[in-house]
Every structure is written in structure tokens, then in C-alpha cells.
């Protein structure tokens, strides 16, 4: 997985961006190299399209070769250049061509950005009672 950082997301939400015909992109040669020779399955970038060519040749090549991509990615300046594990939470699609997803980078412990969950900072309180599904109420209970 490769994310291309251009800092384009730092200019959001300026309405002038929608009128621009050129923006940072990933060239078709770069896409073919990354997917064909480096064998990545997925890449992401900050602008809302892969490239600013008149026919969006990079985007067309990706879609015709079965590759997925993340568009409109933000905060890449806060992720390390290498060594992060990326978790992608996909939305439930209902017939559309795309949708919003949240990308979370699990970074090395010494990374200066983000949050750290300490041993006493678990998101939920501990309980001696186990959760189980209650048929009558239709939900999990303790």
C-alpha cells in the first residue's frame, strides 16, 4: 500500500479547488510501476482524482485493471513515510461507485503524532459480567 503525500488536503475546504483543472496527481507510468513491478494492490492520494490529464488516464487504467484507490486522503503529513500499519474501515455500499472510508495508521510507538492507549486507558470499563445475546430484548446484555 502506498499513499502519495502532496499536502493538497491542507488547502481544504477552499471552494476555489473545485474550479482548478490541474492538481497534484500520480502519473500513469508511476501507477504502472507501483502496481505492476512493486505489486502493490492499493494506493491513495490527497486530491479527489488520480491525475489531472484530460481523460483521467491514470484513473481509467486503475479501474480497468481491478485496482482500488483512496481519494481525498488527509493528514498524511502526520503519518511516517514507512512502517505504519493501515487499517481501512469500509462503508456499506448501496449501489454507488465509491464512498467515504476512514483510514487509521498504526504507527511505531515513538511516533510524535496521534494518541496512545495506556494500560489504564481502555475505552470501556472492565466488568466481571460477560456479555451475552438476550433473545427477548434483541441485544447484548450483561
Per-range role (PLM):
Residues 1-142:
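Active-/binding-site microenvironments in catalytic and ligand-binding cores
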Amino acid at each position: 500500500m502506498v499513499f502519495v503525500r502532496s499536502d493538497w488536503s491542507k488547502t481544504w475546504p477552499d471552494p476555489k479547488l473545485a474550479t482548478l483543472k490541474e492538481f497534484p496527481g500520480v502519473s500513469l507510468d508511476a501507477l504502472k510501476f507501483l502496481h505492476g513491478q512493486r505489486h502493490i494492490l492499493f494506493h491513495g492520494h490527497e486530491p479527489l482524482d488520480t491525475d489531472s490529464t484530460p481523460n483521467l488516464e491514470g484513473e481509467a487504467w486503475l479501474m480497468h485493471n481491478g485496482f482500488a484507490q483512496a481519494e481525498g486522503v488527509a493528514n498524511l503529513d502526520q503519518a511516517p513515510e514507512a512502517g505504519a500499519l493501515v487499517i481501512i474501515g469500509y462503508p456499506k455500499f448501496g449501489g454507488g461507485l465509491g464512498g467515504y472510508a476512514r483510514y487509521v495508521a498504526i504507527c511505531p510507538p515513538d511516533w510524535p503524532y496521534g494518541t496512545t492507549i495506556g494500560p489504564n486507558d481502555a475505552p470501556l470499563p472492565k466488568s466481571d459480567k460477560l456479555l451475552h445475546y438476550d433473545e427477548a430484548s434483541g441485544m447484548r446484555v450483561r
